[in-house]
């Protein structure tokens, strides 16, 4: 690597800092960076926080003052980009230590920000160490958990969905009075609810070991869990990160401790619950898809994730997004809203897989139909997944081409590399055939022309045309003699049925005359 700090536009000053957070605040496809400084105005050469806009050419521009996010000279431990009001623009939360309140900068969408901490209800003053963002109640609005020192305890902020937050630390049972540092959201048991892990250590000069905390989300509240292994050992924990070291779909935890306790990797023993792992790859948006909103729907349940970079205290989570699915066996839909404004939607996904979703994949990798798209019951249709290395259709077929004989939704995973890519599912509908009821009146006499035929289509689609083999057209015929009449009935969906109608007639009447001679 070559150090390009001085030439790429990043300001070269002496400062103290504990975090950088990355986000595309102007949604131009290039990640910008916010540098947090832990300096107050009483320190020599005190610096504010810095926002550097990525110019897309390998250089950055200092837009701190233009954007209005300097935060003054305050003791900032951490900052995080996330969209708290669901307007698609990444906002900025700044967690400040000691006597400095926390700040929430609302993204105005024009390169500037408005500070709304007081109005949003998050401008409290306490020893904010770190902030982690997640949607713990699956309502589609992202909440915050901020760690603190023992005096006031940690803060859980519930997003009310109207631009404000409510402190629910006590009511959610996540309030704890220890020296807390890093915290992460993770669905440790894959039950569809995100749990909470908090790293703890006593503060200098004591540096007493603390017991890390794990709060299991029950769906209605949180309960401290003491049987996970994580919470049975005294640690000197500062930071934690989430990942999946053995790719089993259960999130593992890496904990960074102060010496003499070393770094610890805690492997999740897992279970039988199902899961989905998703990683994003931007094409128009930034490569990692940072700033994307993902919504998973299954059996009427919804889960939401927001992709971030640098949201943890002295750590970074894996870019894999985890969705626990308990005993559900199919995902109804997965929606990715990218920073570019593009939306990918995938339907009817199987569970227990790791997917790399490429921006635009749901429309680029279309399933092609071979032959006519006007299909009726009794016909067949061939679907083409395109040229890839491997295939897995929703039917279980592993061939490129799939022949279908009945209505349904068909999707396929295709792979041209390490991970599978999903195609847009296709709905196939076989139109029902016409159902013809035949009403007849047979000729009343031999060789008479008073026969009658009426065809009544009681099928789903109306009749468009009836053609008889003798050239007549229409559903009603009269003035018919006995015989066999063949027709083709076609409905408005293009489906047809061909049958024949037989009209019988009475036998001819024969008369015989007998003469008897009369003898006189």
Describe the residue ranges of each PLM region:
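Blade-edge motifs of beta-propeller repeat domains
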Residues: 1-15, 52-74, 105-126, 157-178, ...
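Beta-propeller blade termini
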Residues: 17-27, 77-86, 119-120, 128-138, ...
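Short, solvent-exposed loop/turn segments at conserved positions within beta-propeller repeat blades
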Residues: 42-47, 96-100, 149-152, 205-210, ...
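Gly/Ser/Thr/Pro-enriched helix-cap/hinge segments flanking short amphipathic alpha-helices
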Residues: 207, 221-365
């Amino acid at each position: 690597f070559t150090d390009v700090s001085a030439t790429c536009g990043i300001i070269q000053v002496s400062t103290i800092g504990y975090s950088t957070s990355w986000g595309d605040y102007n949604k131009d496809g290039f990640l910008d960076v916010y540098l947090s400084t832990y300096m107050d105005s009483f320190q020599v050469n005190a610096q504010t926080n810095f926002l550097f806009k990525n110019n897309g050419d390998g250089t950055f521009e200092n837009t701190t003052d233009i954007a209005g996010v300097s935060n003054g000279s305050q003791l900032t431990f951490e900052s995080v980009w996330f969209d708290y009001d669901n307007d698609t623009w990444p906002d900025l939360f700044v967690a400040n230590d000691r006597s400095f309140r926390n700040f929430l900068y609302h993204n105005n969408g024009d390169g500037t920000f408005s500070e709304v901490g007081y109005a949003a209800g998050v401008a409290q003053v306490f020893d904010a160490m770190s902030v982690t963002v997640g949607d713990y109640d699956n309502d589609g609005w992202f909440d915050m958990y901020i760690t603190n020192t023992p005096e006031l305890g940690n803060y859980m902020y519930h997003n009310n969905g109207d631009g404000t937050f409510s402190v629910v630390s006590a009511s959610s049972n996540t309030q704890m009075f220890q020296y807390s540092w890093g915290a992460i959201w993770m669905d440790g048991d894959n039950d569809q609810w995100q749990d909470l892990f908090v790293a703890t250590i006593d503060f200098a000069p004591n540096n007493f070991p603390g017991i890390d905390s794990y709060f299991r989300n029950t769906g209605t509240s949180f309960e401290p869990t003491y049987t996970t292994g994580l919470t049975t050992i005294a640690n000197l924990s500062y930071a934690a990160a989430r990942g999946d070291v053995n790719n089993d779909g259960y999130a593992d935890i890496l904990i960074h401790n102060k010496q003499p306790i070393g770094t610890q990797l805690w492997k999740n023993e897992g279970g039988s619950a199902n899961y989905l792992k998703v990683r994003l790859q931007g094409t128009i948006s930034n490569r990692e898809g940072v700033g994307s909103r993902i919504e998973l729907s299954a059996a009427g349940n919804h889960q939401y994730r927001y992709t971030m970079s640098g949201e943890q205290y002295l750590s970074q989570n894996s870019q894999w997004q985890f969705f626990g699915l308990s005993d559900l066996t199919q995902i109804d839909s997965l929606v990715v809203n990218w920073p570019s404004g593009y939306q990918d939607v995938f339907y009817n996904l199987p569970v227990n897989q790791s997917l790399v979703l490429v921006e635009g994949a749901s429309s680029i990798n279309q399933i092609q139909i071979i032959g006519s798209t006007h299909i009726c019951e009794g016909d067949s249709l061939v679907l083409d997944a395109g040229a890839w290395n491997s295939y897995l259709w929703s039917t279980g077929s592993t061939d490129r081409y799939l022949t279908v004989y009945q209505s349904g939704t068909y999707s396929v995973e295709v792979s041209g590399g390490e991970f599978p890519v999903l195609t847009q599912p296709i709905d196939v509908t076989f139109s029902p055939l016409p159902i013809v009821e035949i009403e007849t009146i047979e000729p009343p006499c031999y060789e008479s022309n008073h026969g009658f035929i009426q065809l009544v289509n009681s099928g789903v689609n109306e009749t468009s045309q009836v053609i008889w083999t003798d050239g007549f057209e229409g559903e009603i015929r009269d003035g018919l003699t006995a015989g066999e009449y063949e027709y083709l009935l076609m409905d408005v969906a293009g489906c047809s049925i061909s049958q024949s109608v037989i009209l019988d007639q009475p036998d001819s009447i024969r008369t015989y005359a007998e003469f008897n001679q009369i003898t006189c």
